[in-house]
Amino acid sequence: MNKKTSGQAIAWLICALVAAAQYGNFYVYDSIGPVADLLQQQRGFSDTQVGLLNAIYSLPNVVLILVGGVLVDRFGAAKMTVSTAAVCLAGALLTAFSPDFTGMAAGRLLFGIGAETFSIATLAAITDYFSGGKLAFAMGLTLSIGRLGSYSADMSPDWFSHAYGQGWQPPLLIAAAVAGTSFAAGLLYWWIDRPARRSAAARRANAERFVLRDLLHFGRAYWYLLALCVLWYSVILAFRSTFSIKYFQHVHGLDLATAGAMNSYVFLAAVFATPAFGWLCDRVRRYAPFLALGALLLPVALAIMTLSSLSLWVATALIGVSYSLVPAVMWPLTSKLVKPNRFGTAIGLMWVVQNAGIAGANMVAGWLNDRAGASAQNPAGYDAMMVFFGTASTIGAACALILWLTAGRRQQEAAAQPA
């Protein structure tokens, strides 16, 4: 095996380890939704409290995600991957073993503190080992395998029915065990990366400072994209990760296992479709039209789910396409709208606002459900939540359409000069 072949093998091994670590991260994040009904039945949690368990994940990242990027640049991807994976594991354990809501919320907060910086670190890890045409594919592959963690969390009521039959805690203990495998993968990556520490040093030397005045240089197209980012992610993650399984059970009469399976297909479709959509957009060199299509599918799917008698499979399929298409296009398009030396600032700002939006959407949706008395006995109580999600996703789709019409025509994308 020559040096080049050996280097490629190590790169793909790192990719596999990072993907395995991301799998655990996604699983733990989505572990609350499947036990939401059990938490209400056995521990008396309200919808507001259940929503807060996911909302609190995002709250620290309104600020800390900027700090996390600086720490990754300073200490390197490998060290930050393993250290933040350890924080995530501690958060998952605290969530599973806490005797009350306050302890569980503290565990989810701790998990959130580690998880987003963990994601930045794994992104930097892929960047260290891949370049050129393979970079996007490696990132897409890592994200896709990570999303299998969300699929697995949704399928866990079926796969681990015995654990769910024993109450709310065993499923969360399984999530903590999965977080342990994530930490183990991160630790192995850190050990393999030891000879390549100079890569981290080079990245630290080239790191750019976050300067607030750089925001003044972004064009209107970027702000349309940022608005779509916060609205679209807030709706799809708050609904899918927190409330969808209960909604399917109480409004559409599904049992827990079937509701979890229905919800899981959104992520299962994205596992295969996201890299494919990314390849297609690169192939035809068009981004804004695909982004507008993906954004528009979300309010359409929510309307079908709420207002029509069509099968839930239709709505979940449309959500799956939206969840595959929008992320595949959003991040490459961002690189076309801002200059390379401002790309980190642009992404950092988008993630900050996105986390604030996700936290807010979870809390608002939970409050609306509690206010309306949403339950299996009162399925109409979920209407206010669905109107909220539908309105936000429609505004997001409008931003995507405006972006397409003002800066996303074929000739404009071909001649794009980052602002």
Show which residues each predicted segment covers.
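Helix-loop-helix hairpin linking two adjacent transmembrane segments in secondary transporters
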Residues: 141-194
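Juxtamembrane intracellular "pre-TM" segments in multi-pass secondary transporters
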Residues: 2-8, 193-226, 419
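C-terminal transmembrane helical hairpin of 12-TM major facilitator-type secondary transporters
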Residues: 287-333
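Residue-level signature of mid-helix packing/kink "hotspots" within the transmembrane helices
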Residues: 30, 58-66, 150-151, 267-275, ...
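Extracytoplasmic gate region of multi-pass secondary transporters
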Residues: 32-34, 220-274, 361-362
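Conserved MFS/SLC helix-loop-helix module at the cytosolic interface between two early adjacent transmembrane helices
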Residues: 63-102
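Cytoplasmic helix-loop-helix junction between adjacent transmembrane helices
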Residues: 101, 107-146
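Helix-to-loop junctions at the C-terminal end of transmembrane segments
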Residues: 64-76, 273-286, 369-370
